[in-house]
């Protein structure tokens, strides 16, 4: 297990869960079976690769949420490595969770157990195509990379021109750090092989979209009701990836 554990979901504050569910289902995402851990209204959609958690509660949103079964041990290790927590709940009588901000203010949370049933292995891609990255806007990619390196040491790709972009594995999900001025918020990226099908769904359902938004050659940007941005591309803008392990002992990793 990595220092972060396993990626669970892209969590986002959702004022109207039914409206957001409708948006994702029209694009071909599947609703997942949730547990009873959260007291607030909650739903999850997935394409088999990325899960989006819709939360009817106010928090620092969106958040990258990971599951780590030994949060107490992980929290001690992270604290020893200089991490500061925005919240920390560790007790035998509560659902254990913690949160912190990365160097650019993006929210990361860790919880002790799953909150929904995993997607079936045969869950099909959505009309957006194959998910390939969560992209985070950063001021300085190399500086942000130094923050993330102890938590996610497996580098997939680094591109220096025209803008610096780094991709690595964060708890088994591809995470990108981008200096592109066109990227305004944490966003989801997909490689779409059927543009016509996606365009038809956008037109048929009146989905909020913007053609050629200027981010890495995406041919369309979709805006979900709760604010999640989804980009569709003809190709992965970094091409083929390979994995390089840059750390032998990240904090909190299990031996």
Where are the regions a protein language model picked out?
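Alpha-helix boundary/interfacial micro-motifs
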Residues: 33, 45, 65, 120-121, ...
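Vicinal oxygen chelate
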Residues: 6-15, 44, 56-130, 136, 156-162, 167-169, ...
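Core segments of cupin and vicinal oxygen chelate
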Residues: 1-50, 135-173
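Short, isolated positions in well-ordered beta-strands
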Residues: 52, 174-175, 230
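Short, flexible, glycine/charge-rich loop motifs used to bind or transfer phosphoryl groups or to couple energy/partner
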Residues: 1, 54-55, 124, 178-179
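Surface loops and adjacent helix of pleckstrin homology
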Residues: 34, 57, 111-113, 180, ...
């Amino acid at each position: 297990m990595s220092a972060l554990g396993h990626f669970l979901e892209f969590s986002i504050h959702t004022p109207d869960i039914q409206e957001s569910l409708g948006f994702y289902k029209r694009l071909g995402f599947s609703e997942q079976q949730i547990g009873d851990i959260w007291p607030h209204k909650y739903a999850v959609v997935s394409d088999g690769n990325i899960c989006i958690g819709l939360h009817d509660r106010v928090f620092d949103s969106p958040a990258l949420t990971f599951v780590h079964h030994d949060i107490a041990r992980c929290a001690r290790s992270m604290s020893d490595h200089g991490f500061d927590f925005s919240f920390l709940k560790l007790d035998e009588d509560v659902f254990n969770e913690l949160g912190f901000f990365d160097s650019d203010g993006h929210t990361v949370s860790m919880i002790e157990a799953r909150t929904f049933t995993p997607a079936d292995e045969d869950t099909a891609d959505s009309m957006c195509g194959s998910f390939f990255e969560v992209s985070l806007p950063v001021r300085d990619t190399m500086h942000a990379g130094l923050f993330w390196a102890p938590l996610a040491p497996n580098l997939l790709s680094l591109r220096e021109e025209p803008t610096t972009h780094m991709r690595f594995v964060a708890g088994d999900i591809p995470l990108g750090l981008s200096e592109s001025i066109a990227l305004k918020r944490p966003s989801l990226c997909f490689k779409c092989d059927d543009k016509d099908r996606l365009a038809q769904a956008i037109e048929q359902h009146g989905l909020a979209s913007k053609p050629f938004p200027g981010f890495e050659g995406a041919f369309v940007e979709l805006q979900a009701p709760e604010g999640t941005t989804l980009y569709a591309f003809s190709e992965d803008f970094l091409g083929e990836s390979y994995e390089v392990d840059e750390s032998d002992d990240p904090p909190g990793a299990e031996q």
